[in-house]
């Protein structure tokens, strides 16, 4: 096995099985399917993302998101922007991780009796070294981290400000610059929307969905997306006269 990964998984599976035998009622609650109705219509998808941005940062960010979408009447393009713009605006930083973990803790408390303890596998940017694959190595933190996480989740108002202690990292600066760039691109290309440029503009609007991952992985995907962005902008600015394959 690679670094004992399979052994660790087997041990976890064994512990999980033993826990299920000792706590059958809790196991039953956890294994009961939790069916969530996903948004289906475009309006539902937009409303869902507005709610998420409000929880992520506040009403101001949701309003900023909505203002962009209000400028678009073409449904296909509007959905592309709804997805792409939302992904950029809601980059997963330390404050969002803390908020999500706080939410997870509340769900765990509902699912289990007593006072279950949680451990966290994290790779804090200011504390983590790169592994052999170039990715930050994760460290295990105990339940004592719940207190700091609760505080951190309430400090999201610092996000993107000069007082943000995490905002100076290369990844955070990149994420903020991508938002500014996207807004400028949409302002540039929306007036150029025609039948000939439509597919290229939709592809440009959806491009942020390709920037996945964290750390070196995200940076590599961003570099690929940057190259693709230049290709699409060239098609759009030429009136869609270049090879149609550039927008596929």
Show the residue positions of the predicted features:
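Active-site loops and adjacent core secondary-structure elements that bind or stabilize anionic groups
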Residues: 2-248
């Amino acid at each position: 096995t690679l670094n004992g990964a399979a052994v660790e998984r087997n041990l976890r599976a064994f512990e999980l099985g033993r826990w299920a035998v000792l706590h059958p009622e809790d196991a039953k609650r956890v294994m009961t399917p939790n069916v969530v109705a996903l948004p289906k219509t475009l309006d539902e998808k937009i409303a869902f993302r507005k709610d998420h941005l409000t929880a992520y940062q506040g009403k101001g960010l949701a309003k900023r998101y909505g203002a962009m979408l209000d400028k678009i009447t073409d449904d296909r393009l509007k959905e592309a922007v709804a997805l792409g713009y939302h992904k950029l605006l809601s980059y997963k930083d330390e404050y969002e991780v803390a908020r999500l973990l706080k939410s997870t803790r509340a769900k765990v408390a509902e699912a289990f009796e007593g006072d279950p303890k949680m451990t966290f596998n994290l790779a804090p940017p200011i504390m983590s070294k790169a592994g052999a694959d170039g990715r930050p190595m994760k460290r295990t933190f105990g339940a004592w981290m719940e207190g700091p996480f609760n505080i951190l989740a309430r400090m999201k108002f610092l996000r993107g400000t000069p007082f943000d202690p995490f905002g100076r990292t290369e990844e955070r600066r990149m994420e903020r610059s991508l938002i500014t760039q996207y807004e400028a691109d949409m302002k540039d290309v929306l007036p150029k929307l025609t039948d000939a440029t439509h597919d290229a503009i939709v592809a440009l609007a959806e491009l942020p969905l390709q920037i996945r991952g964290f750390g070196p992985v995200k940076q590599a995907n961003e570099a690929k997306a940057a190259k693709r962005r230049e290709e699409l902008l060239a098609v759009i600015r030429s009136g869609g006269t270049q090879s149609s394959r550039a927008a596929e």
